[in-house]
Swiss-Prot record:
This is tRNA(Ile)-lysidine synthase. The N-terminal region contains the highly conserved SGGXDS motif, predicted to be a P-loop motif involved in ATP binding. It comes from Salinispora tropica (strain ATCC BAA-916 / DSM 44818 / JCM 13857 / NBRC 105044 / CNB-440). ATP binds at residues 33-38. The gene is tilS. Gene3D superfamilies: 1.20.59.20, HUPs (3.40.50.620). It is an enzyme of class 6 (ligase). GO terms for biological process: tRNA modification.
Amino acid sequence: MAALAPPVAAIRRAIRHALIELPDPGPVLVACSGGADSLALAAATAFVAPRLGRSAGLVTVDHGLQEGSAQRAAAVADWARATGLAPVEVVRVDVSGRPGGPEAAARQARYRALTEVAGGLGAAALLTGHTRDDQAETVLLALARGAGPRGLAGMPARRWLGAALLLRPLLEVSREQTRAACTALGLDPWVDPHNADPAYARARVRAEVLPALVRALGPAVVDNLARTARLVAVDTAALDEQASTALDGVRHPDGGLSVGGLAALVPAVRGRVLHAWARELGARPAALSHRHVGALEALVTGWRGQGAAHLPGGLRVLRRAGRLTAIDPGAQV
């Protein structure tokens, strides 16, 4: 018997570790585009899940952005069924007319579809193929836009996606390993031309910025950026937990927040409290920026009688009688 290729073994170990920790015995789903990362993930999951007594299926999303996308999605589905994954779902999404550009629109539509499929099938978890390289790119993009700790924490290894856990088991695996695993398994991954299109910021980081950093600072750059994300994520989780407790402590029975209570909080916690409250009010996380949180902060620590702070979705927040109070869009003040 031929020895198992090290990249294949590494990916299977990562999948096993992720699945063993799942408390819900329900099925798992792999999100697979047919690219090397998600294809290696799907192949490993098809091998590991049954050996843990767990069923595993696959969902592939056709964004309809390229000629032949429907045929490619069908080919991924056929391969998945032949590999033993079940159920297998193909979902077509429409990304036209969505705000934020094609990259953001495709991502939003994809995750909405994945959430619906996972919920409909009662999946315990949805697995995606994001790698250590993806994490490094995410950190660089966050740095470029001036993100705070939450952005620098990168992609979490797990988070809730509707009723299912979203798992990223390959964040400690390199893109080189997923490609090598596909080669070792005789798989022919699809190469997404968008990944090399300089119109997209992530593609430019992948093709130009990260290679330049590796040349200038050495090959450990990718690992170090990913490690930075892990370290920041630990601190961010602790601060978020403090903020959750603090939010309850400053909340007024009418739904507003006590200005005095907010002012007593340390800035790192206060900013998180205001961010969490804005989300409770209905501000979309993707649209909620540091500028919006800063406007809320100014109502607490920079009060000079100014008017309302404006949040995404037409929401407004006023300072009244020692409280921050939300005003419905369109309401007369």
